Regions:
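A structural signal for multi-pass alpha-helical bundles of membrane permease subunits
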Residues: 2-287
Length: 287
């Protein structure tokens, strides 16, 4: 009877998981094996032709490279900044609640609103960056129109938004640590850096693994800002994989190829998550 009761408790969650996760993933995989149907030409089975087209698509490789550099720039920076902010606001400092709120505020703002705020920074001539640069005689620069700077500009905005969110997890982890550890280290004459390196950081590894996985997923799913800032330009210099999927599906109406791109994205995220668990799991628990 207990066995049946357990399955009954599990059933609602299992139905939702299958309906909103497993079934869409399986349907997407199936769609990637067919051509895009039209009113005069029905969809037909093409096997791996869509994947062959993907391998020969230069835009796919460009946006995949963009996403790689975007992840490489945003993930470690936002995690390191979040950890530093959490350590600082965990100390006894004046107006600590106000500082915490200030750090967390970007997180609760919609990405579209954040993009509009940063658009004011980057707008040529009238933007904040150019206004400050003009005070020092620096020429105006089209930050979002230059292929060499546009991706870095979007990275800075995402780091500003994401760091406060990750800070909350690190702050909760820091507050769960026993204060006796720091007291004992102080009595033994350990420096703050030594205590952080040998005690605090190892104890934060479970939180770091959680944050790392979430940051990796976010680096591939956060594309709302592109609709406001660049629309993937110039010349796909700021386009990311998920935004390219959106363009293929809803601008070019090639749903089969969009499904192929989605399958690649799912496999990529699953592989990265497994790799992170395999590499980081060994250092998660402090002995």
């Amino acid at each position: 009877m207990k066995h049946v009761y357990g399955w009954l408790l599990l059933t609602p969650a299992a139905i939702l998981l299958i309906g909103f996760t497993h079934y869409p993933a399986a349907a997407t995989l199936l769609d990637s094996l067919f051509s895009t149907g039209t009113a005069v030409r029905p969809s037909r089975f093409v096997g791996l032709e869509n994947y062959a087209a993907l391998a020969a698509d230069p835009i796919f490789w460009q946006v995949l490279g963009n996403n790689f550099w975007f992840a490489l720039g945003t993930i470690p920076t936002s995690i390191a900044l979040a950890m530093l902010m959490a350590i600082w606001v965990n100390d006894r400092l004046p107006a600590r609640a106000l500082v915490r709120m200030a750090y967390f505020t970007p997180t609760v703002l919609p990405m579209i609103a954040v993009a509009n705020i940063w658009l004011f920074f980057y707008t040529p001539q009238i933007g904040l960056l150019d206004q400050i640069g003009a005070k020092f005689g620096v020429a105006s620069h089209n930050w979002l129109g230059d292929p060499h700077t546009v991706l870095a500009c979007t990275m800075a905005m995402v780091i500003w938004k994401e760091a406060g969110f990750f800070m909350i997890f690190y702050l909760a982890a820091l507050q769960s640590l026993a204060p006796e550890l720091e007291e004992a280290a102080r009595i033994e004459g350990a420096s703050r850096w030594y205590f952080f390196r040998r005690v605090t950081f190892p104890l934060l590894m479970p939180t770091t693994l959680f944050v790392l996985v979430n940051a990796t997923i976010n680096s591939f799913k956060l594309v709302d800002h592109l609709f406001i800032l660049t629309k993937g330009g110039p010349d796909n210099a700021s386009s990311l994989l998920l935004y390219y999927i959106y363009q293929v599906a809803f601008s070019f109406f090639d749903t089969a190829y969009a499904s192929t791109l989605t399958v690649v994205l799912l496999l990529l995220l699953a592989s990265l998550a497994l790799l992170q668990f395999q590499l980081v799991e060994k250092r998660v628990h402090y002995r």
